[in-house]
Amino acid sequence: MRRLPIVLLLSVFSIANCAKVDVDLINETIRDLLHFKSSDPNVTSFHRSSHTLTEHMKNLYENFIDEDSNEDGNLVRAIEPAVGKFEGQEVLVFDVEGFDSHESIMRAELHFYLRRRDSFARRRSRQIRAKSVCVNEYCRQQTLKKIRVGGDENLEEYKVIWDATKSVFDSYHLDAKQAVFRITREHSKMRPYAEMIRKSTPFLVIYSKVNHTLDTVSVMKQTEQTKRKRRDLGNEELREYYNYNSIPLDNDDREPIKRKNGKKNSLSEEISSEDVWQGFGEETSREERERIANEELANDVRVVLLQNKNRCHKEGVLVSLKHFGWDRYVIEPKTIETSFCKGKCAKPMLTSGKASNHAMLQSLFAAEPVCCAPTNLKSLNFWYRDEKGRTVIRNYSKMLIGSCSCL
């Protein structure tokens, strides 16, 4: 039986009990999730992406969050071009090297924006043409077809999108390192490509499907190799092991949550001085809240209701990416939640709880106790820059616990 990604993530951090986790293990886990090979998150820097590309990927990322998936794939890349020359003519060169093995290219789009939005914008957009340039003897040059711009009809006046799926698909399967395109305009000469990139911000968006499962064996192996290198250099003490206890998820750093009556909930200050996660790991020790407040906060990913400390609830830690230097790459999220379900289920179950019908029946007749387990699992989505500076969105399905209940 195939294990779910959430199980793999928890098995790496081992947070079900008192854990002993070091910086190397955390770094290697994040590196594997981002599919990085060797880059040091504290060294590499990139130029700033164009505003249009950033806004496009931001909208896609928000769609992933809202829909918890995307029908076009679980991996999206946005690539900005460099200017090259082929057969004496300028071309746009996109870096498609280093894609995942066994990756399925689902769709590719070439985006182009018209800088001037005047009365002639629609006519100019109709005059723009794009075609792929074959730099491999086994491929063929293709004229790209335009895709109708969804949403606001006015977008068609200054935004052009071409279907580049076939060209990118061929480049990937021919092991090409670059996808090359030429953009022209009917009855008119195009401006120099360097200026065109600056003003029209063309970029290539590629949707793919990949097997997103955390490789725990590889993570542990790479962690040991990192430690071995450090020992060889005599720097064993540069990374310490940290002891910490799993804690109910809450956020002591955020502003107090306001209730409908305008009052604020005070936040717990009972954080152990030995807790390595202090400052970005969260702990709560709250008194029983009013019923209406409980209902409002029950689905808050950071809030655990402690009416009964032994009740079925979600527990874990929030790992800050900034604390480990990965904020240089990762745009969103700021933290990674590693949580699990913990607590006991009453026997017999009470109807006031959120138990399933099966749990209610089992609590009456079965010898085995009812299990505290996830009632739903959510995706973990990364929006980041990869080692080559390309903007990427990765979707790991069923990696986060939405809520826990007695099942």
From Swiss-Prot:
Outcome, altering residue 163 to N: In ev566; axon guidance defects, but at a lower frequency than in ev557 or ev554 mutants
Protein localization: Secreted, Extracellular space
Region (Disordered): 252-283
Pfam family, one: TGF_beta
Signal peptide positions on this chain: 1-18
Key words of the record: Glycoprotein, Growth factor, Neurogenesis, Secreted, Signal
Entry keyword Cytoplasm: no
SUPFAM superfamilies: Cystine-knot cytokines
Keyword Nucleotidyltransferase included in the entry's annotation: no
InterPro entries xref list: Cystine-knot_cytokine, TGF-b_C, TGF-beta-rel
SMART domains from the UniProt entry: TGFB
GO BP terms in the entry: backward locomotion; dorsal/ventral axon guidance; inductive cell migration; locomotion; motor neuron axon guidance; nematode male tail tip morphogenesis
Domain of life from the UniProt record: Eukaryota
GO MF terms held by the record: cytokine activity; growth factor activity; signaling receptor binding; transforming growth factor beta receptor binding
GO CC terms: extracellular region; extracellular space
UniProt-annotated glycosylation sites, renumbered to this chain: 27, 42, 211, 395
Stored Gene3D superfamilies: Cystine-knot cytokines (2.10.90.10)
Family: Belongs to the TGF-beta family.
Biological role: Required for the migration of axonal growth-cones and distal tip cells (DTC) along the dorsal-ventral axis of the body wall. Acts cell nonautonomously and independently of the classical daf-4, sma-6 or daf-1 TGFbeta receptor signaling. During axon migration, facilitates long-range repulsive guidance of unc-6/netrin by enhancing unc-5-unc-40 signaling at the expense of unc-5 alone signaling, probably through direct interaction with receptor unc-5. Involved in cell-cell contact formation in sensory rays in the developing male tail, via a pathway involving plx-2 and mab-20/semaphorin-2A.
Subunit structure: Interacts with netrin receptor unc-5; the interaction is direct.
Protein name: BMP-like protein unc-129
Species in which this protein is naturally found: Caenorhabditis elegans
